[in-house]
Amino acid sequence: MKRIFCAILCLTVLLTGCGSDSSKLSESQLYEQEFDTSKYDSHITFAVDGTSTEKELTEVAKQLEQRIERCFAERNDDHPSVTHQLQTNHADKTVTIYFNNTANLSSQFMEFTAAPNKVELKKGDKADGEIMIAAGEFYDAYAQQDKASGNGSWSVAVKLTNNGRTKFEKALKKMNGKGEQVTLWLDGKALGTYAAEKAVGSGGIITVTGGELIDKQAAWELAYRLRSGHIENKVTVKECSVKEKTQAA
């Protein structure tokens, strides 16, 4: 039987049930409830590999759900929260999220939610370069524009964890004066660089520039993916039906 979980993200990011008695239901009971998905104009179904138990699939489902919630919180000032239903099917190892596309996100963008987001900072510009810090050592990221420069170039500010900052600073000291560069890799693709001669900024922030960061959209997407965290399991988009209203996100 398909197990269904209903989550409504409020502005306070509280998880509530559906209906007046929903708060009295246990999690297992919530998964057994049947809900009407016809009230949603969009949905995306993910196939998840590498889960052997319902608990493991549920954990991945929660990560995917959080990514969808983040999309709406960051891309839509008018509707910063998203009412949605999350459905897991352990037999098929799939996760489906039904929602109303009030943020007008495109199908192409929605597929980013399935990306592993394995981020690494490596010495040099080669894929086999020495890893300086890896996934789990990045705390936050945001796109920014250098308005003082003539071309208004975009970059991504990346905040490291305390452990990540310590490791990165030690690695930078060893590179000092050697003219080497640091490259940010995401899912096996080089997306930006960091000048090795620069010190880590206040609060453990480094600025990644160049590479694929050609405009606001590219910088925002990279920052969003860095904030979304790494999913260990292989996740692919099995089906995506998104109602786009005017201009795609």
Predicted regions and their residues:
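A structural signal for conserved, well-ordered secondary-structure elements
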Residues: 13, 18-249
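Sec-dependent bacterial lipoprotein signal peptides
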Residues: 1-16
